[in-house]
Structures are given as structure tokens and as C-alpha cells.
């Protein structure tokens, strides 16, 4: 018989940098997960994506064992990296902070395709372009 899921914990953690300090420790401690076991496994699985924030969904079972799924980094993180900026515009309608090319948007859309609610590449690109627009990034 399959194990019964007790809780699902969603976190966003920098790749390769999970440690028992907040916010990871308290969130997993409440769920009764072996915190160090999770940190070691997460860091090993994400060490090649250093510098990016990785969303993770941890399924905690009744016997306190766990499995987790890592997702692709959030679109704004990928857009900031592509544009080479620290943060988006405070006033995206008035102040534009950077530009990205259609090819960069296409790459981001393809890498995020599995997590986006889009039927094809064009729809995924429109989602990413909308995110860029709301951050004050111009798409050329």
C-alpha cells in the first residue's frame, strides 16, 4: 500500500545553500522531517544551479519520511539574470531598467515550460514577456 501524505511544504531556497537555519528549519521541523537529511539531499541535487532560487515541494508522509520535487527557478529570477540586473523597476510603467532579446525570452520560456500553464512555446513566451513588462524590462 502506498504511504499516505501527511503534509506538503513549499519553499523557495537558494540552490546548494539549504541549511537548518530559518526559513528551512522551522518549516520542516513543524512537519517532523529530518532537517539535515533534507538539506544534504537538496544541496546535492541543486549544486549545479548555484546562484538561482529553486522552488521545492516537499511531501511529508505519516511515517515522517519525505520526498521532494525541485521546480525551475521563478521567471523574475531568470529574467534578472538574463538582463544582468539586481532588481526590477520600482515603477515599471515609467522607468525601464533593462532590455532582453526575444531569444533570451525563448530560452527562459523553454526552460520553464514544464512549470508554466502554456500549451506551446508562443504562449509560454507571452507569459514570460508579461512578467518582464511588470518588472520594467523591455523585450526586443
UniProtKB/Swiss-Prot annotation:
GO MF term list: large ribosomal subunit rRNA binding; structural constituent of ribosome
Domain of life per record: Bacteria
Pfam families according to UniProt: Ribosomal_L11 (PF00298), Ribosomal_L11_N (PF03946)
Any Gene Ontology CC annotation: cytosolic large ribosomal subunit
InterPro entries, per database record: Ribosomal_uL11, Ribosomal_uL11_bac-typ, Ribosomal_uL11_C, Ribosomal_uL11_C_sf, Ribosomal_uL11_CS, Ribosomal_uL11_N, Ribosomal_uL11_N_sf
Coiled coil: none
GO terms, biological process: translation
Keywords: Methylation, Ribonucleoprotein, Ribosomal protein, RNA-binding, rRNA-binding
Post-translational modification: One or more lysine residues are methylated.
Family as reported in the entry's similarity comment: Belongs to the universal ribosomal protein uL11 family.
Subunit note: Part of the ribosomal stalk of the 50S ribosomal subunit. Interacts with L10 and the large rRNA to form the base of the stalk. L10 forms an elongated spine to which L12 dimers bind in a sequential fashion forming a multimeric L10(L12)X complex.
Role noted for this protein: Forms part of the ribosomal stalk which helps the ribosome interact with GTP-bound translation factors.
Name under which the protein is recorded: Large ribosomal subunit protein uL11
Taxonomic source organism: Staphylococcus aureus (strain COL)
Underlying gene: rplK
Amino acid at each position: 500500500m502506498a504511504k499516505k501524505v501527511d503534509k506538503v511544504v513549499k519553499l523557495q531556497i537558494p540552490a546548494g545553500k539549504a541549511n537548518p537555519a530559518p526559513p528551512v528549519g522551522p518549516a520542516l521541523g513543524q512537519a517532523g522531517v529530518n532537517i539535515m537529511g533534507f538539506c544534504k539531499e537538496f544541496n546535492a541535487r541543486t549544486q549545479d544551479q548555484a546562484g538561482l532560487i529553486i522552488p521545492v515541494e516537499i511531501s511529508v508522509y505519516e511515517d515522517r519520511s519525505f520526498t521532494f520535487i525541485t521546480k525551475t527557478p521563478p521567471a523574475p529570477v531568470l529574467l534578472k539574470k538574463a538582463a544582468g540586473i539586481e532588481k526590477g523597476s520600482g515603477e515599471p510603467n515609467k522607468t525601464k531598467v533593462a532590455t532582453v532579446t526575444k531569444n533570451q525570452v525563448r530560452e527562459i520560456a523553454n526552460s520553464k515550460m514544464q512549470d508554466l500553464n502554456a500549451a506551446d512555446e508562443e504562449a509560454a513566451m507571452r507569459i514570460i514577456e508579461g512578467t518582464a513588462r511588470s518588472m520594467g524590462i523591455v523585450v526586443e
